Amino acid sequence: MAASSALRLILGSSSASRRQILSEMGYQFTLLSADIDEKAIRKEKPEELVVALAHAKADAILEKMQNNGMMKEIVDSQDTTLLITADQVVVHDGVIREKPSTPEEAREFIKGYSESHAATIGSVLVTNVKTGVRRDGWDKAEVYFHKIPDKVVESLIEEGNVFYVAGGLLVEHPLTSPLVEAIVGTIDSVMGLPKALTETLIKESFSEP
């Protein structure tokens, strides 16, 4: 489904890779960020955690829209407005990893990917703003790396992008992409917005409440 004047999309994310993927899918969209305390939400299973976080982000953005007048504009409009929120964690050796908070943590995370594979668990939630219909799902992918040299690890930490992604896992970066041995799943899932799942949820969000 291509973007049209009757469909308005809001991407509730500050992630550059999610913006890139949604653009690749042929959609035009506006951006709003949730600004929530992600560490305040805890779940034992990674699948439950990422779905809960996507819902929390949607709640925060809808409240923001209510306060700034966007919600009234949407309700009065003939257009369908969909809000897309997403979250992702990395699971490595059975441990859930979110964004690294220190250089030491980032170093430990990235070096670990030389020893055993990482799994990405990513959620997508599409909220039909006018009807309140919500459709969510999650997707999983696995990433296998060759040995990541210490020099690459230090360059990534110095550059800083690793602190903005789950598990400090960057597969599309020029320094790390040559070191990826295999991906089981899709690259867009690893990057935080699985295209097939997103398309499915967009279609489903048009259903009756």
Language model features: what each stretch is:
Residues 2-10, 23, 47-209:
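Anionic-ligand binding patches
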Residues 9, 16-28:
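NAD(P)+-binding Rossmann beta1-loop-alpha1 motif at the extreme N-terminus of oxidoreductases
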Residues 13-16, 41-44:
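Generic detector of contiguous secondary-structure segments
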Residues 26-43, 134-140:
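Short glycine-rich, Thr/Ser-proximal phosphate-binding strand/loop in the N-terminal lobe
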